[in-house]
Amino acid sequence: MKFLRNLILSFVFAGAMSLTTSANAACKVHLGDFDWDSANIHTAIAGYILEKGYGCEVESTKGSTTPIMAALFDQQIDIVTEVWRDNLVQLIEDNLAKGTIIELGVNTPSSTQGFYVDKPTAAKYGLKHVDDMKNADIAKLFADPEAPGKGRMTSCISGWTCYTINLVKHKVYGLDEFYTNFDPGSGGALDAAIAGAFKKGKPVFSYYWTPTGLMGKVDLVKLEEPKYDQACWDEMTKVVEDIKANGPDVYKDTCACEYVNMSLTKAASTKFASVASNKPILDFIRAYSIPTPDVNKSLAFYMDESGGDMEETAKHFLANTGIWKKWVPADVAAKVVASL
């Protein structure tokens, strides 16, 4: 996509970057994007097909989870192509009940997230479970230079729901006595912290997830947590949403458990979905689904071969796989192929 503008939409929500593509405006679509690579890839692929295949004017607004999802619920964004639904279950269910969004099926069939330690450190000290981390001598291995006497677990970005989930987990598991729940500031900084520690041979204690390109380059061991339980998760997410709305002082005792392996989903605003002429777009997004191994390949291409160019990554995917042609009519596919 040829991006014509790059600006901060302060009048929509602070800190979000909006990019608009040049097209014939046969339709207009506003995509919500996030500040991590897998979401960026899906937005780039979907946006390229919408522009080149459907002739749409595509606007993409990028930001953290909270403002982007709020904009979707508020009908300011039309479509989000990667939703970590189980991290947002209360918000999603509430907005489905309110009629502000519709769900459009599965994007990526399998994803994981959790707390990880580098394999050499895990093997040397027998670190298998989060309870194994509750030791002052172990915490010293991951010393936080900004919090003397505590270790550091590099966590999510504060604008991501998982940051607050991890905050609650730290309290429930008793990790907060030994570690800070450190906000690295951006997805790129999180990756850099892990990759940099590996390069220097330093211990790593971090939240992380798949699909990502980095996972194929570093050797991380996922720590065991209490087994996933739906009732426990639902109870915990109520506390999480209360903290997100009112601050950490409203924390109350709850249970906690591991993140469930989940399918990532897609959603659209009901305002966009209610327009009859948008049906072909919704049909395309419903059909859009990429197997996890293919997402990992695209992430690796983005990191290693694209020069950090997400459009080139989208074009590489479209030029080298055929699965996307099943998502769209033949004439749309032909236009996309001709543009590559």
Stretches with model-predicted labels:
Residues S38-C56, V168:
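Short, polar/charged alpha-helical segment
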Residues M69-A71, I77-T81, T154-K238:
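Ligand-binding pocket segment of bilobal, Venus flytrap-like solute-binding proteins
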Residues T100-S155:
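A conserved helix-loop-strand patch within extracytoplasmic ligand-binding domains
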Residues T43, T61-G99, A193, G213-V218:
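Pocket-flanking alpha-helical
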Residues I8-M17:
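Hydrophobic helical h-region of N-terminal Sec-dependent signal peptides
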Residues Q113-A123, N261-S277, A300-F301:
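A bilobed periplasmic-binding-protein/Venus flytrap-type ligand-binding module shared by bacterial periplasmic
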